[in-house]
Amino acid sequence: MEYWDIYDAEKRPTGRTMKRNDWCLKDGEYHLTVLGVVARPDGTYLITKRVMTKAWAPGWWEVSGGAAQAGESSEEAVRREVREETGLDISNAEGGYVFTYKRENPGEGDNYFVDVYRFVLDIDESELKLQTEETDGYMFATKEEIENFAKEGIFLHYDSIKRVFEQLQ
């Protein structure tokens, strides 16, 4: 069973945990998620396509990410998520934390912080090992291609993270 730490509105750990996807959070309580934008030096971005069996946003494009596990730092979580979903070790990549945004869903028990990271890494495609339970393909996309996926409504979280793509230019 996976557990997540519970944070207060200032992103301070409360010392309490919740079961994964339990959605028991009160207003003013949050869990922590991470997103890792991975770029090549040529300015293209590694994006993955969600499997069609996902309950939410199947077939959409996204960057690697997920929830931080109890006791895990944000940085540890993003490194784990990128490794699990793509097989890439970003430990020695350039970059790091960029910004945090907060998502509140009053009365739904699902409030969360999202720490957004950006890494630049010279990626050899043979190094990619996609997590088949999560991903159904990948591409190295330009900023314009990602913007077009977003306009089509098939790129997850774009409005919340678009500035991380703009900052790489």
Model-found features: residue ranges?
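Nudix hydrolase/Nudix homology domain
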Residues: 58-59, 70, 97-104, 109-169
